Amino acid sequence: MAYAVEIIGDARMKDLLKGCSAINYHTHKADINGICVELNCQNKDFIDMWSDNFYHMSDHVRPHARIYCVEDDSELHAEYHIESFTMFLFNFDYYGWIKSVALGLAGNILERSHGIYSVHGAAIDIDGRGVTLIAPSKTGKTTQSWGLLRMDNSHLISDDWYFVQFGNGRPRITGSEKNCYIDADIGDVWEEYKPLVTGVKFDNKGRGIGNVRWIRGEGAVIPKSSVSVIILLKRDKEDPAIERRLGVDEALEYLESHDFCNPHQLVRGERDLALRREFFRRYLSECAVFMVNTVCTAEESQERIRKLIKEVI
């Protein structure tokens, strides 16, 4: 994780809240799969991005989780009061971390209290069947998921984070964001996305909130699906295998060895990790699972991924 998270007690939280009460914050509430997460921040640009990024929660709803952004002389870090799901972010200058913390907070509540689990991955509905790409950073997850969105009868659930619930039939998934936090170069591989960036205000990291509906139409984003196919990605030039089907144990071992492909797990106690381990074991067991090694060009990797998907759906 790029930032350290310290778990704090009641006394420290009260001290921090007292200090925050003297700050004139911009405030906005997000609806993240039914969880109300409130952002308190002095940076108006972050508030505007947050408002574009997430579905809105009524101001009359009290927050289930809160984020306070603090600027002081300390190092970049976060302090987390688990009992109240309150996070203090010190000197965060990157919106991507703030929104991931919000998703992590919502995930904590849903995981602990509702049996709903988080996946840091992309999910696309193709002809009514859910496909997810889960991968470590820099292996092409975003590129390949946006490539799949170019298919006929495809709809975006999420390009970054979604929630999973079990029941009758295949695992059910729900998206987390209204609009996507995209890179300025999103159109470099898939040219049809070049017009998407024209109306986006990009931050100091070259990223901004983009609305894929501008390109794919109003129905391009849907809230839910059920998953049939899990694609794991890696980029390993030493491995001659480009694509193959995986068993549950091998797939779970890969995910565990890469921190479940989620650097924004805010709590990592043994109980929490055991819950996630058992979740992923069940999730993998109820879907067809493949590994794709993205050492080829983006276009060739896309062809291979589509071929694997068509074997199942």
Spans of model-derived segments:
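N-terminal pre-Walker A segment at the start of P-loop NTPase domains
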Residues: W97-S118
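Non-catalytic, well-ordered alpha-helical scaffold segments
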Residues: P63-A65, S100, K224-S228
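A short, charged
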Residues: R66-S74, A78, E83, Y117, ...
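Conserved lysine of the Walker
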Residues: K141
